[in-house]
Curated annotation (Swiss-Prot):
One of its GO terms (cellular component) is cytoplasm. This is DNA replication and repair protein RecF. One of its GO terms (molecular function) is single-stranded DNA binding. It comes from Vibrio vulnificus (strain CMCP6). It is found in: Cytoplasm. PANTHER family: DNA REPLICATION AND REPAIR PROTEIN RECF. The RecF protein is involved in DNA metabolism; it is required for DNA replication and normal SOS inducibility. RecF binds preferentially to single-stranded, linear DNA. It also seems to bind ATP. One of its GO terms (biological process) is DNA replication. ATP binds at G30, P31, N32, G33, S34, G35, K36, T37. Belongs to the RecF family.
């Protein structure tokens, strides 16, 4: 469902704004520091309950204010509007409302508003540690496998309890009770992840090939322990090592999506512009897979669209985004940089010192 309306109050340098949106492309144009990225950040907060730029709530609440508020309305296929909103206070208190009902969970926000973010720091998906690629996989599993969220939460709690017990356990038998349930959850989570990667892999590799035809892209899922060995056996065999280290070494919390081009890690081969194109291809593949599996459309947030991309690559990305039929928010310094995306159905907003006006 596309956002039809967005209200932001006391968020960074935006005192207040209330804008009607296009179900297609929405362009935010303004100089650096004007507040255009803050609009994207507010939408991300509405879908995730947190900022993509700061983990500290106090940093996104406007100076001398005690709280922020972001509110959106969605228009479904029956033209019915669903309101959602999030209020965050400086003391860390968060209130979520969906359809006028308060006390909703952040995970419910994510279900209502599936978001894909492409921003200048997004290279970490490819160049940093496995946690970023686990999050990439888990976004897809969360939106396509209803039981995943609770199962993953239970596994993490059990893993934390097991790590605490490792410090005092005299023998493996003291952990066997926890390990039985941990193993069941680990195998389940791993299978969901493997199935998801297998389902979206061909689309991801196809888009990567379209964006980077000079390279052969390879994606391979690693579940976090030896492929042919049951997880409960791994836990028992590694008990002494885990106890020495003080934590459980193997498991789904160590999973990774290994991405190579021409059999070489991507960070050793691709330029920054090529890395950005690959991130775009992977995010678009996820969005397309979501639509095919569930009928839902992603909302795409693209910050600093032109950075790292020449005009030819910008056009290639613009064409692919248009083909999705999804709602897209794009920030850019100049209108010229987004000329390949513009048409009569899109809306353009000028942003200056936190004030947003339709162009």
């Amino acid at each position: 469902m596309p956002l039809s309306r967005l209200i932001i109050q006391q968020f960074r340098n935006i005192k207040a704004c209330d804008i009607a949106l296009s179900p297609g492309f929405n362009f935010l144009i303004g100089p650096n520091g004007s507040g255009k990225t803050s609009v994207l950040e507010a939408i991300y907060l509405l879908g995730h309950g947190r900022s993509f730029k700061s983990a500290l709530t106090g940093r996104v609440i406007q100076n001398e204010c005690d709280q922020l508020f972001v509110y959106g309305r969605f228009l479904n296929s029956d033209q019915f509007e669903l309101p959602i909103g999030i209020n965050k206070q400086r003391d860390g208190t968060t209130e979520v409302k969906i359809g006028g009902q308060s006390g909703q969970k952040l995970a419910q926000l994510a279900q209502v508003l599936p978001l894909q973010l492409i921003h200048p720091e997004g290279f970490d998906l490819l160049t940093d540690g496995p946690k970023h690629r686990r999050a990439f996989i888990d976004w897809g599993v969360f939106h396509t496998e209803p039981a995943f969220y609770d199962a993953w939460g239970r596994f993490k709690r059990l893993n934390k309890q097991r790590n605490a017990l490792l410090k005092s356990a005299k023998s493996y038998q003291e952990l066997s009770y926890w390990d039985k349930e941990m193993a069941r959850l680990a195998e389940l989570i791993s299978q969901w992840r493997a199935d998801y990667v297998a389902q979206m892999q061909s689309k991801a590799e196809q888009l990567c090939q379209e964006f980077l035809p000079e390279f052969h892209i390879q994606l391979k899922y690693y579940r976090g322990w030896e492929k042919e060995t049951p997880y409960q056996q791994i836990l028992e065999e590694n008990f002494e090592r885990d106890q020495t280290l003080g934590y459980t070494v193997s498991g789904p919390n160590k999973a990774d999506l290994r991405i190579k081009v021409n059999n070489t890690p991507v960070e050793d081969v691709l330029s920054r512009g090529q890395l950005k194109l690959m991130v775009c291809a992977l995010r678009l593949a996820q969005g397309q897979h979501l639509t095919e599996k569930t009928g839902k459309q992603c909302v795409y947030l693209i910050d600093d669209f032109a950075s790292e991309l020449d005009s030819q690559r910008r056009k290639r990305l613009a064409d692919c985004l248009k083909q999705t039929g999804a709602q897209v928010f794009v920030s850019s310094i100049t209108e010229n940089q987004i000329s390949d995306m513009r048409d009569d159905s899109g809306r353009l907003f000028h942003v200056e010192q936190g004030v947003i006006e339709q162009g």
